[in-house]
C-alpha cells in the first residue's frame, strides 16, 4: 500500500475519504502520472507538480491545479486570492464532476509536457 493509499484510508471524514478515493483513481488512470504525499496531502505530477487534492470544510475537497492561471478559463476554476493556483471545489462525485476534472487534468498534463 502506498503512502497516498494509507492517507486516504486514514481519513476520519468518510465523505471526504470517498471523494478523494474516486478522484485519486481517476487521476492515476492517466499515463505517466505519479503521486506522492507532500505537505500531508496527495500531489500528482508528471514532469512537474500538476495538482493536489486538499480536504476543505463542509465535507468537500478541492482539486488545486498548480498552473491554474494558464489553463483555459473554466468558470469552475476558482483563484481564491491565489496568484498561480486555481482549484475546483467538489462536494459530490458524479459523472459530470469526474468528466470536468478529467478534462482540466488532461489540459494541465499537456501544459506540463510542453513546459
Q: Language-model segments: what does each one mean?
A:
Residues 1-115:
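Charge-dense, helix-prone N-terminal extensions
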Amino acid at each position: 500500500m502506498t503512502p497516498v493509499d494509507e492517507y486516504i484510508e486514514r481519513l476520519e471524514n468518510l465523505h471526504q475519504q470517498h471523494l478523494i478515493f474516486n478522484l485519486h483513481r481517476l487521476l492515476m488512470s492517466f499515463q505517466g502520472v505519479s503521486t506522492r504525499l507532500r505537505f500531508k496531502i496527495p500531489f500528482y505530477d508528471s514532469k512537474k507538480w500538476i495538482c493536489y487534492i486538499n480536504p476543505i470544510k463542509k465535507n468537500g475537497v478541492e482539486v488545486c491545479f498548480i498552473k491554474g492561471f494558464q489553463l483555459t478559463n473554466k468558470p469552475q476554476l476558482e483563484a481564491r486570492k491565489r496568484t498561480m493556483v486555481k482549484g475546483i471545489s467538489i462536494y459530490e462525485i458524479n459523472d459530470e464532476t469526474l468528466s470536468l476534472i478529467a478534462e482540466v487534468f488532461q489540459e494541465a498534463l499537456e501544459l506540463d509536457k510542453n513546459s
